[in-house]
Amino acid sequence: METLLEIIARREKQLRGKLTVLDQQQQAIITEQQICQTRALAVSTRLKELMGWQGTLSCHLLLDKKQQMAGLFTQAQSFLTQRQQLENQYQQLVSRRSELQKNFNALMKKKEKITMVLSDAYYQS
């Protein structure tokens, strides 16, 4: 039984380590999401400024504005795609963490039962 407790302790340590790694990965994704959101907002703001512009310009300057708008639109689409990918990664991590947490909780229940059995055996002898 005590050997079983040692095995459970090792497994507990492994699960705690994996949970810690997943927590760090979740934080990294959240940070990336915030950076992506900030950049997307800046691009969107600039795009709105360009679209709201009124006036007259030469052909070359109008072409430059059009190219700027096309580039900004492409960047906005890229950020949207990146945000979706980050959200998918985050959901996968949440799912993996949930599964690990279930395993960890089950392991702790087993540990508690074994400890109670050992404790009862100790007091009965």
Curated annotation (Swiss-Prot):
One GO BP: protein transport
Keyword Protein transport: yes
Keyword set, alphabetical order: Protein transport, Transport
Keyword Protein transport in record: yes
NCBIfam families: PRK15352.1
Protein name: Secretion system apparatus protein SsaO
Origin species: Salmonella typhimurium (strain LT2 / SGSC1412 / ATCC 700720)
